[in-house]
Amino acid sequence: MILVTGGAGYIGSHSVVELYKKGHRVLIADNFSNSSPLVIGKLKTITGQEPDFIEVDLCDYNKLKTLTENYDISGVIHFAAYKSVGESVNAPLNYYENNIQSLINVLKLCKERKIDNFVFSSSCTVYGNPEIIPVTEQSKIGKAESPYGKTKIISEEILLDFYKANPISICNLRYFNPIGAHQSGLIGDYPDGKPNNLLPFVTQVAAGLREKLSVFGDDYNTKDGTCLRDYIHVIDLAKAHVNAIDYSSKNKGKYSVFNLGTGQGVSVLELLNTFEAVNNIRVNYEISPRRTGDVEAIYADCSKAEKELNWVAELNLAEMLSSAWKFQQKIVT
């Protein structure tokens, strides 16, 4: 059985679907800080299976230990974390406390229960503002532009130290900008309150739920002055996690790092224009000042994941944007 922390969240829920497809049994652990309890029922609708689920704050180790003791856990995929760059700038202590303590507790559980297969949800934020793009797994770990990014750097250091003392199989996945939704329209990126990421803001403006989108900065050194990102369909990303848990189980005692993206840089304005064209709808936006913590440009070299995980992103930007709009329309209706 695979323990999926944050399994009701955006990336976690899609990964649960893909794990079921590959025949894995899944235990979801979540406290719904970034998600909704309704997701559990939607996962049942999509997969046809009743997910095993525990509601727990991972910062409470005793409760985590108690609630998992009756499950035969062979591997962990650790998604659970606060994830907003902007929010982390305003509430850094919350991010350090939650993101670091939850990781420590899950690793303690692995050590105590002798769980030797661990996949970690890291981020391209660890590269900071890279000097050379595309970034490879060998690229320099940069100066994080936000407390959120710093929690990922610290988490990676904790993982490596833990591995040196307890040589279990660890896959550290540095992924780029996941967007899109499940083809059913039942699960997707549904932020609680004001969106922190670009695409949910775009879809909410398109749906008439918000007046306009703020594009933060048009004076960056990029092709159109707006930030450049590597957007990846959440389903492709979910499939990579399944490959990673299988890879980890076959490569005992190995510590691995993988970039997960498409390898293509897309600007904010390119994304907006493509969204409008694909979905035949206009999005009202305005140019605003730069936002603290934003990196100018980053995209991935994913050749290592292709070679070792036998994984490559398959879904294109148009498919990402059309699926996200389908999900938003289902929410509205």
Model-derived segments and their meaning:
Residues 199-333:
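C-terminal substrate-binding subdomain of Rossmann-fold SDR/epimerase-dehydratase oxidoreductases
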Residues 59, 83, 95, 194, ...:
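Glycosyltransferase donor-binding loop in the core domain
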Residues 96, 145-153, 188-196, 200, ...:
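Short-chain dehydrogenase/reductase
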Residues 180-182, 219-220:
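Short, basic/glycine-rich phosphate-binding loops at helix/coil junctions
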Residues 1-181:
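N-terminal Rossmann-like NAD(P)+-binding domain of SDR-like oxidoreductases, especially those catalyzing
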Residues 183-187, 226-227:
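Short acidic, glycine/proline-rich loop/turn micro-motifs
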